[in-house]
Amino acid sequence: MKVRNSLRSAKARDKNCRVVRRHGRVYVINKKNPRMKARQG
C-alpha cells in the first residue's frame, strides 16, 4: 500500500478504484486489482 499526500493520482490509475473512509483515514481500494491500494496522510 502506498501512502500519499493526495489520492487524486492514485484514484485516476484505474477505473475500478474507489475512495473510501475507514477510521478517519482516506483509502483508495480496487477490488479488481488489489495492488492498486493507497492511503492518505
From Swiss-Prot:
Q: What is any Pfam family matched here?
A: Ribosomal_L36
Please give the name of this protein: Large ribosomal subunit protein bL36
In the record, the note on similarity to other proteins reads: Belongs to the bacterial ribosomal protein bL36 family.
Alphabetically list the UniProt keywords.
Ribonucleoprotein, Ribosomal protein
Single biological process term from Gene Ontology: translation
Record carries keyword Cytoplasm: no
In terms of superkingdom, the source organism counts as Bacteria
* Protein's UniProt keywords contain Ribosomal protein: yes
Q: Record's GO cellular component, any one?
A: ribosome
GO-annotated molecular function: structural constituent of ribosome
